[in-house]
């Protein structure tokens, strides 16, 4: 069985992060049986962001069974995010 998660690296002051947040919440609700969406505030957890090499936000890492399978950098509208995530949903 595959375990899929999407980790959204974000910060409160980041406008694009705040724009993509509700979109990710919708995707999470619509695909709850396929992927888990987690949020990590880079201001509150800088060491974790550094560990994953996060240089700009928003950055979304798709993890499949403990391995990063895809990285998406920057805000996207919902249709574009769904297209990037289609292999995981």
Pin down the residues of each PLM region.
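Thiol-based oxidoreductase modules, predominantly thioredoxin-like and allied folds used
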Residues: 9, 20-28, 32-47, 54
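Non-catalytic, surface beta->alpha helical segment in thiol-disulfide oxidoreductase systems
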Residues: 56, 62-89
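Short, internal strand/loop/helix patches
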Residues: 38, 43, 48, 61, ...
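Short, small-residue-biased leader/transition segments that mark boundaries at the very start
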Residues: 1-2
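Conserved short-loop catalytic and cofactor-binding motifs
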Residues: 11-12, 69
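Hydrophobic heptad-repeat coiled-coil signature
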Residues: 14-17
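Structural cue for short, hydrophobic secondary-structure segments
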Residues: 8-10, 62
